Swiss-Prot record:
Pathway: Metabolic intermediate biosynthesis; 1-deoxy-D-xylulose 5-phosphate biosynthesis; 1-deoxy-D-xylulose 5-phosphate from D-glyceraldehyde 3-phosphate and pyruvate: step 1/1. PANTHER family: 1-D-DEOXYXYLULOSE 5-PHOSPHATE SYNTHASE-RELATED (PTHR43322), 1-DEOXY-D-XYLULOSE-5-PHOSPHATE SYNTHASE, CHLOROPLASTIC (PTHR43322:SF5). It comes from Alkaliphilus oremlandii (strain OhILAs). GO terms for molecular function: 1-deoxy-D-xylulose-5-phosphate synthase activity; magnesium ion binding; thiamine pyrophosphate binding. This is 1-deoxy-D-xylulose-5-phosphate synthase. GO terms for biological process: 1-deoxy-D-xylulose 5-phosphate biosynthetic process; isopentenyl diphosphate biosynthetic process, methylerythritol 4-phosphate pathway; terpenoid biosynthetic process; thiamine biosynthetic process. The gene is dxs. It catalyses: D-glyceraldehyde 3-phosphate + pyruvate + H(+) = 1-deoxy-D-xylulose 5-phosphate + CO2.
Length: 624
């Protein structure tokens, strides 16, 4: 099945292939990726789109001496295959297996850990500056997608590099046509000339000679520069990058290996910063992914023939529940608007966009802008809901404080993927949001125990006159009858189970379900307990917590946030302020970054399973 792929165990093996063999290898890699990712899950469409780009990159440059940085990093699978990790792909994104992102601990070819968007150009500037300070000569290349270019950080870095004129190559992987390509023979001719080493040298020599002609030299050069700049605005599609100080090359067909290799090889000889614009097709080689690239961006295991997932949960996801409720609220209140930072599908806002297109805003990968944009809307009478993953919400922290909470504006943050998300690992877990949000004045902060409660919290936020954050996990929840649902009230929790006063368990959010199972297991051992659903992280139900703590012998809190600054810590501070000298056992995430893997495996490692907590309580109770 594979003529060349199985012979590649290092970058040196790959470099032995000729161009015709590499074209065959490209198709073998696509077949391998589809087969492999269909079993493990992962980022499929983006990797299928960069096969030829990655092959040309590794032929034209010499990794690891030359430094290649992958923005976001989810498109680095081909890079991993070429650098000796093909035989680990059966463990991709699995517990203790191969990461789905570049990791410095994995390979010397992974120069910089990535996971979030728009960071690669800044990192490249850092590496290039270190290179120049050390008087080294290697190349630094940042590979960034057109989507990531919507992030302001990318342009901050472009601005800095253009001013410094460092030798850095930025490869823009454009798979959405967000920069319109120029066409025609003149464009191709100009690009060919501008990348030719001899042209660069002759151009520099001619400019030097003309500028040194007595009396008229500098005037001639100024006239020539003005003419060149005027023509450039008509014919050069990358004039924006030229104005930032980059030599712009492109667009180049991202699936023509020969063209890519040729232009990359010649780009190495250009002095100063270069932006190479490459046009690719996301999902290339797998028809279903080409037709629906968003659907196949990140996938669970699936059937190759149909593209359908192997396992499917019939319940609604928390994202869908939040989005569905928001649509209903917006039908009742025309001041409600929804905002996403390039993730309408992931955050459950697709239906809102269809139902209320004039009140839906996708701002691109720009969380900082989204947060202040929301505050501006709120300042003028609207009720914005900004749906965002917990890990990406970190990027908007100052805007939440400075632009929304200080002014006490009615902005709601729907914080999706809170807690451990599993296979994407450290860069994607939402393990810090309670720590960094609970300290902000004016912010009301909630965590629902299930889908019904999430829906009610969205409705509560729609009527609340102040900033609100609601955190909820990746996962699904049924929407059974609300017969046992007690209405929400600001700053009030609820008791969801009571069999006695031996142990008090405060189980935050969706851990309340496991808390109920813990209580029932303890009963079988004649240990009787009370289970509380806090609902509000801030303001927490201080009166109920203090009352319950004083009645019980053992106190446990359970959450999926870091132990430092988490909900359990807030409970400890509350008891200390009330001079209650009872120890609180905080079951939370440790003070370290949690690796990738199945969530159940990670909880087992971290001591957060039902059995482990029951065993802890039983031991503590027996020691009383």
């Amino acid at each position: 099945m594979y003529k060349y792929l199985m012979e590649i165990n290092s970058i040196e093996d790959f470099k032995k292939l000729n161009s015709n063999e590499i074209k065959v290898l490209a198709e073998e890699i696509r077949h391998f990726l589809i087969e492999s990712v269909s079993k493990t899950g992962g980022h499929l469409a983006s990797n299928l789109g960069v096969v030829e780009l990655t092959l040309a990159l590794h032929q034209a440059f010499n990794s690891p001496e030359d430094k290649i940085i992958w923005d976001v990093g989810h498109q680095a699978y081909v890079h991993k295959i070429l650098t000796g990790r093909r035989d680990q792909f059966s463990t991709l994104r699995q517990y203790k297996g191969l990461s789905g992102f570049p990791k410095r601990y994995e390979s010397e070819h992974d120069q910089f850990d990535t996971g979030h968007s728009s960071t690669s150009i800044s990192a490249a500037m850092g590496l290039a500056t270190a290179r120049d300070l050390n008087k080294d000569k290697y190349k630094v290349i940042a590979v960034i997608g057109d989507g990531a270019m919507t992030g302001g950080m990318a342009f901050e870095a472009l601005n800095h590099i253009g001013q410094s004129q460092k030798d850095i190559i930025v490869i823009l992987n454009d798979n959405e046509m967000s920069i319109s390509p120029n066409v025609g023979g003149l464009s191709n001719y100009l690009n060919k000339i501008r990348t030719a080493p001899i042209y660069s040298k002759v151009k520099d020599d001619v400019e030097y000679l003309i500028s040194n002609i007595p009396a008229i030299g500098k005037s001639v050069m100024k006239t020539a520069e003005k003419a060149k700049d005027s023509i450039k605005y008509f014919f050069v599609p990358g004039v924006l990058f030229e104005e930032l100080g980059f030599t712009y090359i492109g667009p180049v067909d991202g699936h023509n290996y020969h063209s890519l290799y040729d232009v990359m090889n010649r780009t190495k000889n250009i002095k100063g910063p270069v932006l190479l614009h490459v046009m690719t097709t996301k999902g290339k080689g797998y028809t279903l992914a080409e037709k629906h690239p968003d659907k196949y961006h990140g996938v669970n295991s699936f059937h190759i023939e149909t593209g359908e997932p192997i396992s499917c949960n019939e319940n609604l996801s928390y994202s869908e529940i939040a989005g569905k409720t928001l649509v209903e609220c917006a039908a009742e209140d025309e001041k409600i608007v929804a905002i996403t930072a390039a993730m309408p599908s992931g955050t459950g806002l697709n239906n809102f966009a269809k139902k209320h297109p004039e009140r839906f805003f996708d701002v691109g990968i720009a969380e900082q802008h989204a947060a202040t944009f929301a505050a501006g809307l709120a300042a003028n009478g609207f009720k914005p809901f900004f749906a965002v993953y917990s890990t990406f919400f970190q990027r908007a922290y100052d805007q939440v404080i400075h632009d929304a909470c200080i002014q006490d504006l009615p902005v709601t943050y729907l914080i999706d993927r809170a807690g451990l998300v599993g296979n994407d690992g450290e860069t994607h877990h939402g393990s810090l949001d309670i720590s960094f949000l609970s300290c902000i004045p004016n912010l009301t902060f909630m965590a629902p125990k299930d889908g019904i409660e999430l829906s009610e919290m969205v409705r509560f936020a729609a009527k609340h006159n102040g900033p609100v954050a609601i955190r909820y996990p990746r996962g699904h929840s049924n929407m059974d009858s609300q017969e046992n649902f007690s209405p929400l009230a600001l700053g009030k929790g609820e008791i969801t189970y009571h069999s006695g006063n031996d142990v008090l368990i405060l189980a935050l959010g969706t851990f309340n379900k496991m808390g109920l199972e813990i209580c029932k297991d303890l009963e079988e051992n004649n240990i009787f307990s009370t289970l509380m659903n806090p609902r509000f992280i801030k303001p927490m139900d201080e009166e109920l917590i203090v009352e319950m703590v004083q009645k019980h012998k053992i106190i446990y809190t359970i959450e999926d946030n870091s132990k430092i600054g988490g909900f359990g810590t807030l409970v400890q501070v509350l008891l200390n302020d009330n001079q209650i000298l009872k120890p609180v056992k905080v079951c939370a995430l440790p003070d370290r970054f949690i690796e990738h893997g199945n969530v159940e495996d990670l909880y087992e490692e971290l001591g957060l399973t039902k059995k482990q907590i029951v065993d802890q309580i039983k031991k503590e109770f027996s020691d009383l």
